[in-house]
Structure formats: structure tokens, C-alpha cells
Amino acid sequence: LQSKMAYTAQITRNTPTAFLFLVDHSISMQKMTSLFGEEMTMAEAAARIVNRQINELVYRCIKSNETRHYYDIAVIGYGERAYSGWNGDLEGRDFVSPEELREHPYKKIITREEKRTRKGVVVKEVEKVQWVEAQHDGSWTHLHEAFSKAQQLLNQWMEKHHDKDCYPPTIINITDGEFNGATRESLLQQANELKSMFTNDGNVILFNIHFTASKSAAEVVCPIEISELRGNSYAETLFNMSSLLPERYNADISR
């Protein structure tokens, strides 16, 4: 790595970055959870989170009605195997551009979202574009297969951008944490291998979003200590897989 401060590269068309969403499609994701005060399956909540983030990424690329190629975006669904998670015209694709996403929406739905107003936070109904459908039909939760596919895609992406000062790719894994088919130790090793990949601007970032069906469990955001997870073994494993949040973001998170 270069000696300059990491995670400071400007994201441009010449120096893009990448986002990979890994989405648990196993049958255990049919359990119920809550998102913005609305009861739904974990699979539906995962799909809404991914679609919402993609909406935001695409919106940030629109300049004077031109959709600029700031990011490459991939969705990997996983159950017994790992596969492209796109629906509609993009089905079967791996990385796609913001322009392709803007031109090929899957469908539109009405969702409830928190909006900040002068009177505080309110929940409003909004129309949102979807590219990813909720799924919970996998008999297994082979996270190791998703990690392997993510590494394959990132190897290809890094080869294409290795000589550029690109902000490192970000991996976001969304799951209830009930993985099987591989040991905890081997999954931690795979996670470490992903996090050891790097661009000139820093190492790949791996985040995990963990769903629980427990209505009594309080939401934990960006835990600093493993003790904050109150002994939930699935959450603890995901915590140990995750990247440390880059220091430059600490001030934003603490607000």
C-alpha cells in the first residue's frame, strides 16, 4: 500500500469502486423481523435494504441526466450454491453499471421509509425501484460459496483496475447468520482473504448485516466490542469476520 492515508481516493469514472451485496436466500430467512416499524420476512427486509442502497448509488451517479460509471455493482444470492442475485433483464449478470441499472429496473413497489423533517423523523410511504426480489427457498446456507464467488469477481475487478488509485471495493453480507456446510474457522479464513485484497487506497471492506427474529433484541449498530452482542454466537462470528470501520468514518458514525 502507498503511504498516503487510506480510504481517501476520489471516486470518479476513471477511478471507480465496486459494491458486492451477498444476500442469504436460505429457508431460515422466511422468519419474521421488523424494518422501519413494518413486519416482514427477513428475506423481504434484505431485499429492501439492497434495493434501497442500489437506488441511492444510482442516484449519486446521475449528473445532468447522464448516468456516470462511478461504481460496478454485483448482487450474489446464496443458499446451497452462490449465483447472480439480479432479477429481470439483468438476471444472470455479475457486475453491472449504474447506467444499466437505471435503464433496466425490475419493478416498482410502495415501501415505508424513515424521513428526517424539521419536526423529527417520520415514516412515509414512497415508491421505490427494485432490481432484487426477496427469496428464502435455499435448503442450505453456504456462505462459503458466496465468499468464493465474491473473491472470483473481485480478482477480475482488481486485475482491471490494479494500476488505478481506486477506493477499495465494499462487500455487504446480509444474513441471519445460520450458516452451514463449512466450519467457523474456514469462514473466518475466507473473510480474512477477502479483507486482505487491496487497491492503492486500502483493503477491501467487509460489512455484515445480521437479522434476528427476537423481538426483545435491541438494534446494535457498528458495535465496537463483541460484548455488545449479548452472547449471540451467530452475531459474534459475523463480528469477527467484519472489517474495522476506517478511522475517517468514526466521526460520522458517532453523530
Predicted segment positions?
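Acidic, low-complexity intrinsically disordered regions
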Residues: 1-255
